[in-house]
């Protein structure tokens, strides 16, 4: 099943296998990223997995549960434990994921929901506590993650 393959690969930071779970024209949305196409989604997973493998592998752990899917859609609960590379702070992110599948079982749409303010307080400390609730701050995070992904994709075509 696609979702078990995705999260099993994520747990071991295997971005190559994760990328094979997505359709060519897939979309991905969460509070930090809004992506279109397998290239961008694959690039995000490769960028995040590479950063964790390089800098903070010992702090990484992923747990997933409540994986449900039929031929058309699915959902899962997952929790990531990691060290945020920008601040070197430990984060425990709790995520609910929703999926829509193509007829051949690949992910056409992937939406992750998590409490952005909770995440920002853990990842950024005081600054996240003060600003993490503000839509402007979340927009700025999206701008920064988009720039980081664009830079990564330029270096890893």
Q: Which residues does each predicted region cover?
A:
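Short, low-complexity N-terminal intrinsically disordered segments enriched in polar/charged residues
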Residues: 1-20, 24, 146-157
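Hydrophobic alpha-helical core bundles mediating ligand binding, dimerization, or RNAP-core interactions
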Residues: 3, 10, 22, 45, ...
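A general structural-boundary detector
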Residues: 5, 28-31, 85-86
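Hydrophobic pocket/interface hotspot
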Residues: 6, 18-19, 26, 37, ...
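A solvent-exposed, acidic/Ser-Thr-rich amphipathic alpha-helical stretch
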Residues: 15-19, 23-74
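A beta-strand edge to alpha-helix "cap/lid" segment located at domain peripheries
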Residues: 53-56, 63-157
